[in-house]
């Protein structure tokens, strides 16, 4: 649930309540594209030192590597990342544009050739939600 705490002109301050914690807005989100921050920052550092409120992960990249089957076997994304705070996952839609040379758009969704190993990947709305 989102609560608007203060507004002045076009600026707003609020908070999201999630089952994994509260996110104060505006917020800076670290991007852990494939469930990890580049540069050797650990989940403990993010929580304790950097006071990170939420982690952003990319659905397409998680699906390609490490793979949603591995994340599932590990007990879900929170356990895989050793992260107990909120996680925001995108739909993978940005890759429709950024990987334009590796994709084909159809009525039912998008077919990609993996940028890692070339394997064929399909992502429609249902697949995106399932991965997330």
What are these regions (language model features)?
Residues 1-131:
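Non-catalytic, usually N-terminal nucleic-acid engagement modules in DNA/RNA processing proteins
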């Amino acid at each position: 649930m989102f609560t608007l705490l203060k507004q002045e002109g076009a600026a707003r301050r609020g908070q999201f309540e999630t089952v994994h914690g509260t996110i104060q807005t505006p917020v800076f989100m670290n991007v852990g594209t494939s469930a990890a921050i580049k540069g050797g920052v650990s989940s403990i550092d993010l929580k304790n030192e950097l006071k990170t409120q939420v982690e952003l992960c990319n659905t397409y990249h998680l699906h390609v590597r490490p793979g949603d089957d591995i994340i599932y076997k590990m007990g879900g994304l929170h356990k895989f990342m050793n992260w107990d705070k909120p996680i925001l996952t995108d739909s993978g839609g940005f890759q429709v544009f950024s990987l334009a040379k590796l994709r084909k758009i159809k009525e039912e969704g998008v077919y990609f050739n993996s940028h890692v190993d070339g394997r064929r990947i399909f992502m429609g709305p249902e697949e995106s939600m399932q991965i997330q």
